[in-house]
From Swiss-Prot:
EC number: 4.6.1.12
Site (Transition state stabilizer): 35, 134
Protein's name according to its UniProt entry: 2-C-methyl-D-erythritol 2,4-cyclodiphosphate synthase
Pfam families the record matches: YgbB
Native organism: Listeria monocytogenes serotype 4b (strain F2365)
Cofactor(s) annotated in UniProt: a divalent metal cation
Encoding gene per record: ispF
Subunit structure: Homotrimer.
Domain of life: Bacteria
Residues engaged in binding a divalent metal cation: 9, 11, 43
Length: 157
């Protein structure tokens, strides 16, 4: 059996926050604003995985109204979901994700993100692809107001 899921997330850039994308701290004057650490890439991946198993969305498991998840490490949230997925007998076929940001440039960090995500999903790095793009200064990402991410995951049983 194969299952496909897709995920999307967006967070606003704000001062006085660390920028964490794909589980990697990126030096920048702003970070992403959110209830947790606001890791936009890991949130999109987590949502894609939850979608692939037909279990709703990330907000169902980790509501932003629950103080237990205040400033939560998104890598730990992904690991919690992945444990459920593995317990159900699924493994990663492949994952493809895109980060959409005007600044900072993500390309120097993509390989580190790929390795970290593969580690979190107990997968080979060849099963994980992460890429970065801009919107050519269009929209909220182009105006440097926020960062978005998309993810597609294939699970196999």
């Amino acid at each position: 059996m194969i299952r496909i899921g897709q995920g999307y997330d967006v967070h606003k850039l704000a001062y006085d926050r660390e920028l964490i994308v794909g589980g990697i701290k990126i030096p920048y004057e702003k970070g992403l604003l959110g209830h947790s650490d606001a890791d936009v890439l890991l949130h999109a991946i987590t949502d894609a995985i939850i979608g692939a198993i037909g279990a709703g969305d990330i907000g169902h498991f980790f509501p932003d109204t629950d103080m237990a998840f205040k400033d939560a490490d998104s890598a730990e949230l992904l690991e919690e979901i992945w444990q459920k997925v593995e317990a159900d007998g699924f493994r990663l076929g492949n994952l493809d994700a895109t980060i959409i940001a005007e600044k900072p440039k993500m390309a120097p960090y993509v390989e580190q993100m790929k390795l970290r995500i593969a580690e979190l999903l107990h997968a080979d790095s060849a099963q994980v692809n992460v890429k970065a793009t801009t919107t050519e200064k269009l929209g909220f990402t182009g105006r440097e107001e926020g960062i978005a991410s998309l993810a597609v995951v294939l699970l196999e049983k």
